[in-house]
Amino acid sequence: GPILCLFSWFCYLFIKTGKFSYMFFVILVILFISTLLLLQPDIGTLMLYLSSFFLLIILYLRNIKLFFILGFFGVSLLAFAYFTFDHVNLRIDNFFSSESSPQVARSLSAIIGGGFFGVGLGEGQLKYSIPESHNDFIFAILIEEFGILFGLFIALLYPIFFFLIKQILKSQPNLFIQNTTFSLCFILCIQAFINIGSSIDLIPPTGMTLPFISYGGSSMLSYAIIFGTLINFSKNEKNSFSNTS
């Protein structure tokens, strides 16, 4: 959240002043975050952050050619990760193979077993058979215990949240707040899509948590910071940034 806001601020200053020094800081932030995440390595989070950074650059510069250039860069990075990191290679190969990975197979079985109304709170078995199930496969656990209808309700909360943010942005004249709010909302919604998609075998598992639902102190803190920033932007449409817009 804070890093994305800082990145957006440097982009905003570059657009307003035209000084290349601000673009230098933009590139520096990208390289710094990319290096830290590659050293872990956490390719899923790296792709999430880079897509958010690229989205901000496109929103500020509004250049369709840049969209294709950054898209090509993203695909190249994914190809690099596939041929460099064994765990990325394994997850992608398992996804495109005829059989699902054991974890995803158990997740799908739990979803089917839950039916429309679930087996009841605490009665699900998936959480006992998959490591870190409270993070990566929390969505499947919810469906198993509370049912498909409850899972659909949870899944719909994120696009509804995105729609509400778009409504707020309609009355926001400041470019910095517009783009930063949109990108923060993008992170939350895309991360939710990735988590849910991996639980139902739409995309390869990445280990990403489900915003505001998965267990985890650091991830919950980051969501709280993002949500607090969004609330602050929505309540202060005419703040100090408006003087520079």
Predicted ranges, named:
Residues 18-39, 43-83:
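Hydrophobic alpha-helical segments of polytopic membrane proteins
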Residues 168-207, 213:
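Loop-to-helix entry and N-terminal half of a specific, functionally important transmembrane alpha helix
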Residues 7-21:
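Membrane-interface transmembrane helices that cradle and orient dolichyl/undecaprenyl
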Residues 1-11, 29, 45-56, 73, ...:
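Hydrophobic core segments of transmembrane alpha-helices in multi-pass, intramembrane catalytic enzymes
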Residues 66-152, 176:
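Hydrophobic, glycine- and aromatic-enriched re-entrant/interface helices and adjoining loop segments
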Residues 145-165:
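Hydrophobic alpha-helical transmembrane segments
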Residues 51-66, 126-150, 207-224:
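Interfacial segments of multi-pass membrane proteins
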Residues 195-245:
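A juxtamembrane structural motif centered on a specific transmembrane helix
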